[in-house]
Regions:
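Alpha-helix-loop-beta-strand connector modules within alpha/beta enzyme cores
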Residues: 1-6, 28-48, 77-106, 139-148
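Glycine-rich phosphate-binding active-site loops on the catalytic face of alpha/beta enzymes
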Residues: 25-33, 65-78, 109-146
Length: 148
C-alpha cells in the first residue's frame, strides 16, 4: 500500500520533511507555498463552494479538496455541507484531481467516489474503537478495499 505524507497548513514544515502540503483558505496562499517548496512538491488546497473551487482551479496546486460533503464532527466551525449533488455539479468545473472531505465513512465513500471525487480524505471513520494495532490494521484494509 502506498501512502502520501501530507502536512496540514505548514508549507515550511512540508518542505523540510520533503512532504506534500495541504492548505486551507486561511493559510499561506498556494502561490507563496509554491515559491518556497520544490517545483515537484505536491500542494493541495481546500475549497468549500463554487467560488472557492473556481478560484482554486487557477492556483498552482496539484489537487483541490471540496467539503464538507456531509456533516462532520472533526471541525469546530465547519462550512455548510456540500452534499453529493453539489459535488457532482462541481466536479465538472475542474480537471484537477478532486478530494472529497468531511463526514465521509466506509458506508458513504463509494457514493462520494461515484459522485465524482477522485479521492476521499477521512478523519473520524479512520480510527476504530478500541484503537488497537489489529483493529487499526483491519480498518485500514477496509478503507483500501473501498477505495480501489
Amino acid at each position: 500500500m502506498n501512502a502520501l505524507f501530507v502536512i496540514n497548513d505548514r508549507a515550511d514544515v512540508a518542505m523540510l520533511l520533503d512532504a506534500a502540503v495541504h492548505l486551507g483558505q486561511d493559510d499561506l496562499p498556494p502561490t507563496a507555498a509554491r515559491r518556497i517548496m520544490a517545483q515537484e512538491s505536491i500542494i493541495g488546497f481546500s475549497t468549500h463552494n463554487e467560488a472557492q473551487l473556481r478560484a482554486g482551479d487557477q492556483e498552482p496546486v496539484d489537487y483541490l479538496a471540496i467539503g464538507p460533503i456531509f456533516a462532520t464532527g472533526s471541525k469546530q466551525n465547519p462550512d455548510p455541507v456540500v452534499g453529493l449533488e453539489e459535488l457532482r455539479r462541481l466536479r465538472a468545473l475542474t480537471k484537477k484531481p478532486l478530494v472529497a472531505i468531511g463526514g465521509i465513512t466506509r458506508a458513504t465513500a463509494s457514493s462520494v467516489l461515484q459522485a465524482g471525487a477522485d479521492m476521499v480524505a477521512v478523519i473520524g471513520d479512520l480510527y476504530p474503537e478500541p484503537c488497537t494495532k489489529s483493529a487499526l490494521r483491519a480498518r485500514t484494509e477496509e478503507w483500501v478495499s473501498i477505495c480501489r
